[in-house]
C-alpha cells in the first residue's frame, strides 16, 4: 500500500509540473507590460516597444523556467531516493512468481504406439481431454502396419497430435518355429524405430510410452510430472509405470489413490523412461518380446520402477497378438483410478531407495504371519495387516493362486513384487505375500 501511495505522489508531482508550466506560459503571453495597459494601436505605432515587451516576457519566462528546472531536479532526486528505498522496477514487471524451489515443468512427450486399431480415437480423446499443457506434453503418434483407416483417424486430430509413420512394413525373416510370433517381431521393430525418433531425432529428455488401446486416468499427466524428478535423481530407478499388475478392484485400497510403491517387475502399459536409458538399451534392443527382455537381470541391473496402488491406465484392446487370452483372463478387470491426486504437491521422497527399504521392510516383517488358509477364510480379523510367507517357487505360485494375485514369474521376479514381496488387499485388509526376512536376491530359474 505504501509503495502505491509513493508512486502516486511521484505521478501527481509530474502532472503538477507540466500543468504549472502551461499556466505560466499562458500568463506571460497575456499579461500587460508593467505600468500600463497594452493596446493594439500603441504596439502597432511603436515597434521598439513591441520588441522590448517580447524581450521582457522572454526574460521572465527564462527566469521562471530556471526556477522550474530546480523544482524538477528536486522531484528527480526525491524519486531516485524513493526508488532505491523501495526497489521500484524500471522495466516491465516480471512473470507471475512460482513457488520458491519449484522448477519449470519439463517437456515430456507422450509416445502413442499405434498399428491397425481405429479405436485409437478412444486413447487420444482421453489424452487430449486430460492434458494440462500441449507445450509440456506433446502427443506423438507413431503408426506401424500401414492401416489406412487408423491413419485417417489420427489425421483427423490435425495439429493436436504429431503423426509419424514407421517406414519399414516388410515381413521379418524368422525361424520356422517363430512364424506364429511374427507380430511380436514387428512390435519390437516398431518400438525401436519410434523410441529412436523420440530420443535421437527429436532430442527429448524423456518420454511416456502408451499403447493405442490404453485409456488414461484424470491424473495421468500429474502422476508422471511429479515422478519425473524422482526418476532423474535416483539411479536405483529406471522407469515409472502407470500400471499395477494386481490392480483388480477388490485387490486395491480405493481410499488411498495417492499410494505409490517401488517394484522390481517392469510393468509397462504406460511407462516413463529417460533418454539415458534408451541410449543404454538401443544398441542391444531385441528382435522380439521386448517387454520380457526388459525384465531380464542383464537389463534391469537391480533397478526398480515406481508403480501406483491404483492403475492410471486401463486397456480396452482385446484384439492383439495375444489373441485376447490375457485380456479376458486378467487385463479387463484392472481398476482405473478416477480420483485426481495432486501428486506434484505431495512429498514423494519416501520412494527413494534407502528410506523406502527401511520403512517398507519394517512394515512387512512387522506384520504378524498368518497361514494362507486363515487369510482366505478371513480368520483373525483383529490382526489387520498380515504376512503370508513362501519359501519356494512352488509355494509362491500356490499361495498366489489361492489369494488371486498374478502367479507368474519373470527371471524370478513376481508381478508387482519388490524384494520378493507382493502387497495387495484381500477381503478388506492388507496382505504381504513375502519370502523369509533373510531373502537375499531373486533366483532367475524361478520361471
UniProtKB/Swiss-Prot annotation:
GO terms for biological process: in utero embryonic development; protein N-linked glycosylation; protein N-linked glycosylation via asparagine; UDP-N-acetylglucosamine catabolic process. Interacts with MGAT4D. Interacts with BRI3. The active site is at 291 (proton acceptor). Its cofactor is Mn(2+). It comes from the Eukaryota. It is a single-pass type II membrane protein. The gene is Mgat1. Residues 1-6 are cytoplasmic. This is Alpha-1,3-mannosyl-glycoprotein 2-beta-N-acetylglucosaminyltransferase. Pathway: Protein modification; protein glycosylation.
Amino acid at each position: 500500500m505504501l509503495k502505491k501511495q509513493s508512486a502516486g505522489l511521484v505521478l501527481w508531482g509530474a502532472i503538477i509540473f507540466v500543468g504549472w508550466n502551461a499556466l505560466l506560459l499562458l500568463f506571460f503571453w497575456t499579461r500587460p507590460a508593467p505600468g500600463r495597459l497594452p493596446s493594439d494601436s500603441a504596439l502597432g505605432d511603436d515597434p521598439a516597444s513591441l520588441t522590448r515587451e517580447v524581450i521582457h516576457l522572454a526574460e521572465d519566462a527564462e527566469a521562471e523556467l530556471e526556477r522550474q528546472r530546480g523544482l524538477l531536479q528536486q522531484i528527480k532526486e526525491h524519486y531516485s531516493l524513493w526508488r532505491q528505498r523501495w526497489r521500484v522496477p524500471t522495466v516491465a514487471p516480471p512473470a507471475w512468481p512460482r513457488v520458491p524451489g519449484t522448477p519449470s515443468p519439463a517437456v515430456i512427450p507422450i509416445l502413442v504406439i499405434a498399428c491397425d486399431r481405429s479405436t485409437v480415437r478412444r486413447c487420444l480423446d482421453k489424452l487430449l481431454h486430460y492434458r494440462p499443457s500441449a507445450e509440456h506434453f506433446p502427443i506423438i503418434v507413431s503408426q506401424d502396419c500401414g492401416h489406412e483407416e487408423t491413419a485417417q483417424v489420427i489425421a483427423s486430430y490435425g495439429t493436436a497430435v504429431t503423426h509419424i509413420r514407421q517406414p519399414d512394413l516388410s515381413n521379418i525373416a524368422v525361424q520356422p518355429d517363430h512364424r506364429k510370433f511374427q507380430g511380436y517381431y514387428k512390435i519390437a521393430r516398431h518400438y525401436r524405430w519410434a523410441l529412436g525418433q523420440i530420443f535421437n531425432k527429436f532430442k527429448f529428455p524423456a518420454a511416456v510410452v502408451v499403447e493405442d488401446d490404453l485409456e488414461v486416468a484424470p491424473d495421468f499427466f500429474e502422476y508422471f510430472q511429479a515422478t519425473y524428478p524422482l526418476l532423474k535423481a535416483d539411479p536405483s530407478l529406471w522407469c515409472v509405470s502407470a500400471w499395477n499388475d494386481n490392480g483388480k478392484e477388490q485387490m486395491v485400497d480405493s481410499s488411498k489413490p495417492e499410494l505409490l510403491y517401488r517394484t522390481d517387475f517392469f510393468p509397462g502399459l504406460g511407462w516413463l523412461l529417460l533418454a539415458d536409458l534408451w541410449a543404454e538399451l538401443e544398441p542391444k534392443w531385441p528382435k522380439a518380446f521386448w517387454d520380457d527382455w526388459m525384465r531380464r537381470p542383464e537389463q534391469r541391473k537391480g533397478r526398480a520402477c515406481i508403480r501406483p496402488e491404483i492403475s492410471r491406465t486401463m486397456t480396452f484392446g482385446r484384439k492383439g497378438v495375444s489373441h485376447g487370452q490375457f485380456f479376458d483372463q486378467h487385463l479387463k478387470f484392472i481398476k482405473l483410478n478416477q480420483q485426481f491426486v495432486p501428486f506434484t504437491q505431495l512429498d514423494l521422497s519416501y520412494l527413494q531407495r534407502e528410506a523406502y527399504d527401511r520403512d517398507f521392510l519394517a512394515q512387512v516383517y512387522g506384520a504378524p504371519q498368518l497361514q494362507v488358509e486363515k487369510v482366505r477364510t478371513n480368520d483373525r480379523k483383529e490382526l489387520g495387516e498380515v504376512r503370508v510367507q513362501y519359501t519356494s517357487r512352488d509355494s509362491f505360485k500356490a499361495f498366489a493362486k489361492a489369494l488371486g494375485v498374478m502367479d507368474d514369474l519373470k527371471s524370478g521376479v513376481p508381478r508387482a513384487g519388490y524384494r520378493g514381496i507382493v502387497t495387495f488387499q484381500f477381503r478388506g485388509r492388507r496382505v504381504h505375500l513375502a519370502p523369509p526376512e533373510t531373502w537375499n536376491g531373486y533366483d532367475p530359474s524361478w520361471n
